[in-house]
UniProtKB/Swiss-Prot annotation:
GO terms for biological process: tryptophanyl-tRNA aminoacylation. This is Tryptophan--tRNA ligase. Homodimer. It comes from Mycobacterium leprae (strain TN). It comes from the Bacteria. It is found in: Cytoplasm. Catalyzes the attachment of tryptophan to tRNA(Trp). L-tryptophan binds at residue 145. InterPro entries: aa-tRNA-synth_I_CS, aa-tRNA-synth_Ic, Rossmann-like_a/b/a_fold, Trp-tRNA-ligase, Trp-tRNA-ligase_bac-type, Trp-tRNA_synthetase. Pfam families: tRNA-synt_1b (PF00579). NCBIfam families: trpS. It catalyses: tRNA(Trp) + L-tryptophan + ATP = L-tryptophyl-tRNA(Trp) + AMP + diphosphate + H(+). SUPFAM superfamilies: Nucleotidylyl transferase (SSF52374).
Length: 343
């Protein structure tokens, strides 16, 4: 089956579990979403969600979660997501996500769910007493997020491939019993997605789950702090600036970062730094990053100072999302034989 709009649908989202998105989020994901809006406006209908329901698989302070949900949405807009071209909304504003998650949970084998790698890793770290059923069923909710919108393409990293495979499997399993219910989504990998690594551990990708904040370039950090972090970035004991991720991961990461925020290709940058030291590379990278993030931070500050614009965007987005996901739920409920509500 295909969507009635004729567009390919895309769904993606970010958890509101930090006070700021980091440069890896921006360059590895969200700027790619932005590019889709403008490069292929007649091909894709995009749904970009703040996935707050996923956030509560670990304990959250209510006021902090409320603020982080808004600031995450604000960063979507500040990075260039256009609510006139894409649907921007908050997951908990659309009941279909949890409704569909329950249905899909009834089609998910316990063994299949227990084999999800991220659950096993987190359960091992947290211990049985701290591991919730919500964390266990997290991938099923992810599948519901995707399938509720008849999603064709899901921009995901390698670490989420297993969860997307679950969504595909559940769609196919349901369709085998109730044909033509779900679109089976495919993985979407942008051609030029930047891979940004931790400044303090350049063999690990930049992630908000890192043990230390020292390696993260947060979009909303004070510029002076970003400069300090980049100047302290791990490099190596050599002096030559060349691109070699295996041998020189730290230097290569700085080159990637500078290339991503300036648009200058890495080979050109390497030629510029012939005869220069790591200090020059760090200085220039820091300046380029500050120039990139400063207008983003300014726009977020503006949106958060007066929430009217942001709240309207999220309300309109939730209505559009509910219109689409509600039709999916009606189709699912009809297939299952649930009694329709009358009146």
């Amino acid at each position: 089956m295909s969507t009635a709009t004729g567009f390919s649908r895309i769904f993606s989202g970010v958890q509101p579990t930090s006070d700021s998105l980091h440069l890896g989020n921006a360059l590895g994901a969200i700027t790619q979403w932005v590019a889709l809006q403008y490069d292929h406006p007649d091909e894709y209908e995009a749904f970009f969600c703040v996935v707050d329901l996923h956030a509560i698989t670990i304990a959250q302070d209510p006021e902090t979660l409320w603020r982080r949900t808004l600031v995450t949405a604000a960063q979507y807009l500040a990075l260039g997501i256009d609510p006139g071209r894409a649907v921007v909304f908050v997951q908990s504003h659309v009941p279909a996500h949890t409704q569909l998650a329950w249905v899909l949970g009834c089609f998910t084998g316990f063994g299949q769910a227990s084999r999800m790698t991220q659950f096993k890793d987190k359960a091992l770290r947290q211990g049985a007493d701290s591991t919730t059923v919500g964390l266990f069923t997290y991938p099923v909710l992810q599948a519901a997020d995707v399938l509720a919108y008849d999603t064709d393409l899901v921009p995901v990293g390698e670490d989420q491939r297993q969860h997307l495979e679950l969504a595909r499997d559940l769609a196919q399993r349901f369709n085998s019993r109730f044909p033509d219910t779900f679109v089976v989504p495919d993985m979407f990998i942008p051609k030029m997605a930047a891979k940004i690594y931790d400044l303090a551990d350049p063999t690990s990708k930049m992630s908000k789950s890192a043990s230390s904040d020292a390696g993260l370039i947060n979009l909303l950090d004070d510029p002076a702090l970003s400069v300090k972090k980049i100047r302290a970035a791990v490099t190596d004991s050599e002096r030559e600036i060349r691109y070699d991720p295996e041998v020189k991961p730290g230097v290569s990461n700085l080159l990637n970062i500078q290339s991503a925020v300036t648009g200058v290709d890495v080979d050109t940058l390497v030629q510029r730094y012939v005869g220069h030291g790591y200090g020059d590379l760090k200085k220039d990278t820091a300046e380029a990053v500050v120039e990139f993030v400063s207008p983003i931070k300014d726009r977020v500050d503006e949106l958060m100072a007066d929430l009217t614009e942001l709240e309207v965007v999220l309300a309109v987005g939730a209505q559009r999302a509910q219109d689409v996901a509600g039709k999916t739920m009606q189709r699912v409920y009809d297939r299952l034989g649930f009694l329709p509500q009358r009146g």
